[in-house]
Amino acid sequence: MMKCLLIATGQHVPTWVAQGFAEYHRRLSYWLPLELVEIEPSMRGKNHDPQRAIEDEGRRVMAALPKQPYAVTLDVKGKPLNSEQLAQRMEHWRGLGRNLVFLIGGPEGHSQEVLNISNERWSLGPLTLPHMLVRLIVVEQLYRAATILTNHPYHRGK
Protein backbone atom coordinates (compact mmCIF):
# COMPACT_ATOMS: atom_id res chain seq x y z
CA MET A 1 0.00 0.00 0.00
CA MET A 2 1.21 3.47 -0.84
CA LYS A 3 2.47 5.53 2.05
CA CYS A 4 1.81 9.28 1.96
CA LEU A 5 3.85 11.67 4.09
CA LEU A 6 3.75 15.39 4.62
CA ILE A 7 7.22 16.34 5.82
CA ALA A 8 7.12 19.85 7.21
CA THR A 9 9.93 21.85 8.74
CA GLY A 10 8.74 23.43 11.96
CA GLN A 11 7.16 22.42 15.21
CA HIS A 12 4.87 24.08 17.73
CA VAL A 13 2.32 25.41 15.27
CA PRO A 14 -0.36 27.84 16.46
CA THR A 15 -3.41 26.08 17.93
CA TRP A 16 -5.71 27.26 15.15
CA VAL A 17 -3.36 25.78 12.50
CA ALA A 18 -3.17 22.48 14.40
CA GLN A 19 -6.97 22.35 14.74
CA GLY A 20 -7.54 23.11 11.06
CA PHE A 21 -4.93 20.57 10.02
CA ALA A 22 -6.47 17.92 12.28
CA GLU A 23 -9.93 18.47 10.76
CA TYR A 24 -8.82 18.16 7.13
CA HIS A 25 -6.44 15.33 8.01
CA ARG A 26 -9.39 13.43 9.49
CA ARG A 27 -11.52 14.04 6.40
CA LEU A 28 -8.71 13.11 4.01
CA SER A 29 -7.84 9.88 5.87
CA TYR A 30 -10.84 8.07 4.38
CA TRP A 31 -9.38 8.52 0.90
CA LEU A 32 -5.65 8.97 1.43
CA PRO A 33 -3.98 8.17 4.75
CA LEU A 34 -1.46 10.95 5.37
CA GLU A 35 1.25 10.99 8.02
CA LEU A 36 2.63 14.32 9.23
CA VAL A 37 6.36 14.29 9.99
CA GLU A 38 7.61 17.46 11.65
CA ILE A 39 11.26 18.37 11.16
CA GLU A 40 13.01 20.30 13.88
CA PRO A 41 13.88 23.75 12.54
CA SER A 42 17.34 25.24 12.86
CA MET A 43 17.89 27.85 15.54
CA ARG A 44 17.38 31.38 14.35
CA GLY A 45 19.00 34.03 16.47
CA LYS A 46 21.18 37.11 16.35
CA ASN A 47 24.00 35.42 14.41
CA HIS A 48 21.66 33.41 12.18
CA ASP A 49 23.19 32.04 8.97
CA PRO A 50 20.27 31.37 6.57
CA GLN A 51 22.27 29.10 4.25
CA ARG A 52 23.48 26.96 7.12
CA ALA A 53 19.91 26.70 8.44
CA ILE A 54 18.67 25.58 5.01
CA GLU A 55 21.40 22.92 4.77
CA ASP A 56 20.82 21.64 8.33
CA GLU A 57 17.07 21.39 7.78
CA GLY A 58 17.67 19.74 4.40
CA ARG A 59 19.75 17.00 6.02
CA ARG A 60 16.95 16.33 8.51
CA VAL A 61 14.38 16.20 5.69
CA MET A 62 16.53 13.76 3.70
CA ALA A 63 16.86 11.51 6.77
CA ALA A 64 13.06 11.41 7.15
CA LEU A 65 12.36 10.28 3.58
CA PRO A 66 11.15 6.74 2.91
CA LYS A 67 12.96 4.64 0.30
CA GLN A 68 12.43 5.70 -3.31
CA PRO A 69 9.77 8.33 -2.65
CA TYR A 70 7.91 10.32 -5.24
CA ALA A 71 8.69 13.75 -3.82
CA VAL A 72 6.48 16.77 -4.42
CA THR A 73 8.22 19.85 -3.05
CA LEU A 74 6.31 22.98 -2.17
CA ASP A 75 8.32 25.72 -3.85
CA VAL A 76 7.48 29.24 -5.00
CA LYS A 77 9.25 28.41 -8.29
CA GLY A 78 7.15 25.30 -8.78
CA LYS A 79 4.14 24.75 -10.99
CA PRO A 80 0.93 26.43 -9.82
CA LEU A 81 -2.10 24.12 -9.98
CA ASN A 82 -5.78 24.90 -9.76
CA SER A 83 -7.97 22.48 -7.80
CA GLU A 84 -8.96 20.39 -10.82
CA GLN A 85 -5.34 20.10 -11.96
CA LEU A 86 -4.31 19.02 -8.46
CA ALA A 87 -7.03 16.35 -8.53
CA GLN A 88 -5.61 15.05 -11.82
CA ARG A 89 -2.10 15.00 -10.34
CA MET A 90 -3.41 13.14 -7.25
CA GLU A 91 -4.95 10.49 -9.46
CA HIS A 92 -1.62 10.17 -11.29
CA TRP A 93 0.40 10.01 -8.05
CA ARG A 94 -1.84 7.31 -6.61
CA GLY A 95 -1.31 5.23 -9.74
CA LEU A 96 2.47 5.31 -9.43
CA GLY A 97 2.54 2.75 -6.63
CA ARG A 98 5.33 4.64 -4.87
CA ASN A 99 5.49 6.35 -1.51
CA LEU A 100 4.25 9.90 -2.00
CA VAL A 101 5.92 12.67 -0.03
CA PHE A 102 5.02 16.35 0.15
CA LEU A 103 7.88 18.54 1.39
CA ILE A 104 7.35 21.89 3.12
CA GLY A 105 10.50 23.84 3.91
CA GLY A 106 11.30 26.31 6.64
CA PRO A 107 11.23 30.11 6.42
CA GLU A 108 14.18 30.23 4.00
CA GLY A 109 12.99 27.35 1.81
CA HIS A 110 14.62 24.07 0.80
CA SER A 111 18.22 22.98 0.45
CA GLN A 112 19.55 22.22 -3.01
CA GLU A 113 19.78 18.56 -2.01
CA VAL A 114 16.04 18.47 -1.29
CA LEU A 115 15.24 20.31 -4.52
CA ASN A 116 17.42 17.85 -6.45
CA ILE A 117 15.47 14.79 -5.29
CA SER A 118 12.12 16.41 -6.09
CA ASN A 119 10.09 14.71 -8.78
CA GLU A 120 7.77 17.70 -8.97
CA ARG A 121 7.63 21.19 -7.54
CA TRP A 122 4.25 22.60 -6.62
CA SER A 123 3.69 26.31 -6.07
CA LEU A 124 0.78 27.67 -4.07
CA GLY A 125 1.24 30.92 -5.98
CA PRO A 126 3.33 34.06 -5.76
CA LEU A 127 2.12 35.04 -2.29
CA THR A 128 4.51 34.79 0.63
CA LEU A 129 2.87 32.46 3.14
CA PRO A 130 3.95 31.52 6.66
CA HIS A 131 5.44 28.04 6.35
CA MET A 132 3.33 26.86 9.30
CA LEU A 133 0.15 27.86 7.44
CA VAL A 134 1.24 26.01 4.29
CA ARG A 135 0.67 22.61 5.93
CA LEU A 136 -2.97 23.55 6.56
CA ILE A 137 -3.42 24.81 2.99
CA VAL A 138 -1.84 21.66 1.56
CA VAL A 139 -3.99 19.22 3.54
CA GLU A 140 -7.14 21.20 2.64
CA GLN A 141 -6.19 21.18 -1.04
CA LEU A 142 -5.47 17.44 -0.94
CA TYR A 143 -8.89 16.91 0.63
CA ARG A 144 -10.47 19.14 -2.02
CA ALA A 145 -8.73 17.11 -4.74
CA ALA A 146 -10.11 13.91 -3.21
CA THR A 147 -13.63 15.37 -3.20
CA ILE A 148 -13.29 16.33 -6.87
CA LEU A 149 -12.24 12.79 -7.74
CA THR A 150 -15.15 11.30 -5.79
CA ASN A 151 -17.76 13.87 -6.90
CA HIS A 152 -18.31 14.95 -3.31
CA PRO A 153 -20.19 18.27 -2.98
CA TYR A 154 -17.41 19.93 -0.92
CA HIS A 155 -15.89 21.29 -4.12
CA ARG A 156 -18.50 23.16 -6.08
CA GLY A 157 -16.17 24.20 -8.90
CA LYS A 158 -16.87 27.05 -11.23
From Swiss-Prot:
The keyword tRNA processing does not apply. Transmembrane segments: none annotated. GO terms for cellular component: cytoplasm. It is an enzyme of class 2 (transferase). InterPro entries: Alpha/beta_knot_MTases (IPR029028), RlmH-like (IPR003742), tRNA_m1G_MTases_N (IPR029026). The keyword S-adenosyl-L-methionine applies. Its EC number is 2.1.1.177. Gene3D superfamilies: 3.40.1280.10. Disulfide bonds: none annotated. It is found in: Cytoplasm. It catalyses: pseudouridine(1915) in 23S rRNA + S-adenosyl-L-methionine = N(3)-methylpseudouridine(1915) in 23S rRNA + S-adenosyl-L-homocysteine + H(+). S-adenosyl-L-methionine binds at L74, G105, L124, G125, P126, L127, T128, L129. Keywords: Cytoplasm, Methyltransferase, rRNA processing, S-adenosyl-L-methionine, Transferase. Specifically methylates the pseudouridine at position 1915 (m3Psi1915) in 23S rRNA. Belongs to the RNA methyltransferase RlmH family. Homodimer. This is Ribosomal RNA large subunit methyltransferase H. The lineage of its organism: Bacteria, Pseudomonadati, Pseudomonadota, Gammaproteobacteria, Lysobacterales. The gene is rlmH.
